[in-house]
Amino acid sequence: MGTPGGGRRWMTLISITLLMVVGLGLYWDELSLSAGISPATSPRRAEGLLLGRLPLPMEPSILSPLEHLIEPPLQYKLMTIRHIPPVMPGTGMPHPYVGDCIQCHLMVGGPAAGSQFKTPYGAVLENLSRVRKLGPPILPTTRQPHPPAGRCIKCHDIVVKVPVEKKSGIKWLL
């Protein structure tokens, strides 16, 4: 059998440990505030306080390998846009930002279609594209390899990447 009072020692040790844990829990907020870490501190700033420097904006964080394991990268599919609707100024964006709206869209109440600057050569290309689009499909960020010919959509189909899973919360209106 055990020694007399052995059960009391364990109970006393457990009680003291429990009191220390509760005390540390109550004092934890004071410890973190004195270190400069508040509940509103971003993970990037907390990491900087702990490691002594702020990571660069594009530098992976300490937890990024774990984040990549938990959440796989987004899968994209290509979508061809053959018609771009006019938009009202001041309305929300129906897709992620690609550039100035007027690069692709006509504004309701703005300049009319065909009022964009174009060279005579560009005007001929635009007129020929009314029957069948002459240009190859392009990305929205493609640089113009020819003289100005009005809006790109008149001669080219625009190819965009659309996420397969709509986790991002962006409502795609295409």
Curated annotation (Swiss-Prot):
Gene3D superfamilies: 2.30.42.60. Heme 2 binds at residues 152, 155-156. Belongs to the magnetosome MamT family. It is a single-pass membrane protein. Probably binds 2 heme groups via the magnetochrome (MCR) motifs. Heme 1 binds at residues 101, 104-105. It is found in: Magnetosome membrane. Residues 1-9 are cytoplasmic. Its cofactor is heme. GO terms for molecular function: metal ion binding; oxidoreductase activity. Induction: Part of the probable 17 gene mamAB operon. May play a role in magnetite crystal maturation. May transfer electrons to balance the Fe(2+)-Fe(3+) ratio during magnetite formation. It comes from the Bacteria. This is Magnetosome protein MamT. It comes from Magnetospirillum gryphiswaldense (strain DSM 6361 / JCM 21280 / NBRC 15271 / MSR-1). A motif (MCR (magnetochrome) 1) lies at residues 87-107.
